[in-house]
Design a protein with these regions (language model features):
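Flexible "arm" and connector segments at domain edges
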Residues: 2-69, 73-104
């Protein structure tokens, strides 16, 4: 996304409902073959990796990091839908991992 447009969006009052968010995910899945969506997800995860690396080295910026985190988050939602993973299954798996993290 164009950086200026992203910043303008952050400063706007846009707030999608859960239904609108789910519809956007469905539209993305219906527009492109599932393998292409998976490839896009991998690319977005790589961009997040690069942005985190920049943060570690002191060259990153907060807006860039947020944008890549959100892209990766959206891609996770796409993958959940593509691979038919229910919100309940995701939450249970998150709880298992968080419990392990909590005990460290």
């Amino acid at each position: 996304m164009n950086r200026t447009r992203f910043i303008q969006g952050l400063n706007s009052n846009i707030e999608l409902s859960d239904k609108e968010r789910r519809r956007a995910i469905r539209n993305s899945i219906n527009k492109r073959p599932w393998k292409l969506n998976c490839t896009i997800a991998m690319e977005e995860f790589a961009e997040l990796t690069q942005q985190v690396s920049k943060q570690i080295r002191g060259y990153g910026d907060r807006i860039g990091l947020i944008e890549e985190m959100v892209d990766a988050y959206i891609c996770l939602k796409l993958l959940e839908s593509i691979f038919n993973i229910s919100p309940e299954d995701m939450q249970k798996a998150i709880d298992v991992k968080m419990d392990r993290e909590r005990k460290r």
